[in-house]
Amino acid sequence: MTENPLGYEKIPKLLKNFAVPSIVASLVGSIYNIVDQIFIGQGVGYLGNAATNVAYPFSTICLAIALLVGIGSASRVSLCLGRKEPKAAAKAAGNGIVLMGIFGIIYLLVGETFLSLLLKAFGATTDVFPYAKQYASITLIGMPFLIVTNGMSNLIRADGKPKYSMVCMVVGAIINTILDPIFIFVCDWGIAGGAWATVIGQIFSFILALRYLWRFQTIHFEKESFLLDIKESLKICSMGISSSSNQIAVTVIQIIQYNSLTYYGALTKYGTDIPLAACGIVMKTNAIILAIVVGISQGTQPIIGFNYGARQYHRVREAYMLAIKWNLVVSTIAFIAFQFFPQSIISLFGDGDELYFEFAVLFMRTYLFMVLVNGVQLLSSSFFTAIGKSLKGALLALTRQTFFLIPLTLLLPLRFGIMGVLLAGPVADFSAFILSVVLVGIELKKQKNATHILSLIHISEPTRRRGIS
């Protein structure tokens, strides 16, 4: 078995090779929803945008499942390879793939069975509900394929092939983008056309991802690798829980936000549907930035995991700090775009009246005001997951959404009305940033001390041997 370049290649080169394809692959996941939103907004109107927004929690739950198994199994694989345990790595990967399939089928069945109930819980109004039901009933068909594809992409990156992972996602996005205008406008299928275009794109990505099973280089599968092991499954889920819990929290906050916006919006001149549609556009625009941060995080994960397992702590620190610098560049560009060009961005998603644009611009500028720092929490959570400290990673993943954003979204509107929903975002972002800096700072200091101790051991070994001889 050849030596893994994760252990010796220069960190900037590794991060470029791993993060850039991961960013592209992660962006594709957001583009699936963005492309639908743009074409549906142009073809159906703002009620169509509101409908895709109401159905969006199905996608975030799907991603949570994919991250639970995908990040969990990939983290296990990276640690096992770093410790030179190839059989354990194969077992982790095999069990992860089986879990992806099982969870995907269960999710489809549960979603279709309770579709109407879930859409109402997600905040669908009377006017939006029929559009949302038509869209969600179709897109749920593609969820099992999406779970396997997203989960496999993490394993493919852990195997040292981030470009192939990127190709899998890009092919599906291209097909989706081509089919969207054909199905929506040419075939006149409306919102259903956008849904079918998404599903077909996901199936093509799934086929490409599954083909990689016979191409793994650092992992050598045997039949036993795919036998579901409860202990191994629990280890996988425990290591993926931090990334997954963050997505689950995103889903919860989406539901709370949608219901808060419709409730407090009804008390204002904006009504119920305008805040719902505007929220969807702002969130999905921000999802592009978050996708880049997630891509950087996923690209950094195998580098950090492998070198932590190999006790090369100086490389762990270097990888994390470089990822933070990349994030700062992206966040600065995003801040400028959101604060100075909000109406231009919102106009991409279709037309609306003056009230619609007034609220959407206000929403974007206020809610995304602290975009400069909100990526640090995601990178830090992934950092702890990569080094095997899944509990701390899960705790950090939950800070922004669960500990800060949910209570603020419930409490601030009591004093500030619908404006309180918007203000909750930047306050939660800044609070999570402070906590992330403190926790990661403590961990990096521990690793620095461990590096010093290891260097002393290496120095003393030759001296002791000379003394014996």
Give short role names for the model-derived ranges.
Residues 17-36, 138, 149, 172, ...:
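Transmembrane helical elements of multi-pass membrane transporters/channels
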Residues 31-50, 119-126, 182-189, 251-282, ...:
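Helix-terminus/linker motif at the lipid-water interface of multi-pass membrane proteins
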Residues 49-109, 146-165, 258, 278-342, ...:
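Small-residue-rich hydrophobic transmembrane alpha-helices
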Residues 36, 73, 114-115, 152, ...:
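Hydrophobic/aromatic residues in alpha-helical transmembrane segments
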Residues 1-19, 77-142, 186-241, 304-370, ...:
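Short alpha-helical transmembrane segments in multi-pass integral membrane proteins
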Residues 12-31, 58-65, 141, 167, ...:
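Residue-level signal for short hydrophobic patches within transmembrane helices
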Residues 61-64, 176-177, 206-210, 288, ...:
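Hydrophobic transmembrane alpha-helices of multi-pass small-molecule transporters
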Residues 70, 139-157, 165-173, 194-207, ...:
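Short runs within selected transmembrane alpha-helices of multi-pass transporters and secretion channels
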